[in-house]
Amino acid sequence: KEIFIMYIGIFHMECLYIHGSDIRGFKGVAGGVIRWIKLANDTAVAVDQLGVRQGSCAVYLDVWHRDIPEFLNLRTNNGDDRMKAHDVFPAICFPNLFWRLAKENINSNWYLFCPHEVKEVMGFCLEDFYGEEWEEKYRLCIKEPRLDKRILTVKDLVKLILKSQVETGTPFIFNRDNANNANPNSHKGMIYSSNLCTEIMQNMKEILD
């Protein structure tokens, strides 16, 4: 998915290792999604149409991703500048479960996972599901003791989102369940994210050629 979306100025970062995860038996060596987003940031700045117009790109990450708190600080002016990407447009993909918990019990726990670890341990990718099927898979991950979890309350995460939006105008909000429930071509694939302005939604598939 990442390779396909890079060609149209959108980065869906879901399958990358979280910061500090293991790679091929080496402990804690993964740099996380922020390092790769910085590459997208520099690419957008470099592609300026002969100095006429700076390139732009949106970066989408799921709200259950372990790096989401750091992702929300991408464009803020405080903190480590090595972890910033001021020229990209962050966006978050939400399931309906998140907003339902925010409405019914905002102090509920929200569990963050490493997508690569989920795939290795559980044998599936959370981002490949939506709606009730996604909620079922998410709850299986919560119950799985072999998965490392980062736990925030829904309230704390909403506060981080609002703080970022007040300071930077981002992240954009993409409700993936709603998009896929309304998808007239759901028999042909799944919608993972959107475009720079969050108004175009198309089926996305891996490039197999």
Predicted regions and their residues:
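Active-site cavity-forming subdomains of large catalytic enzyme subunits
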Residues: 1-209
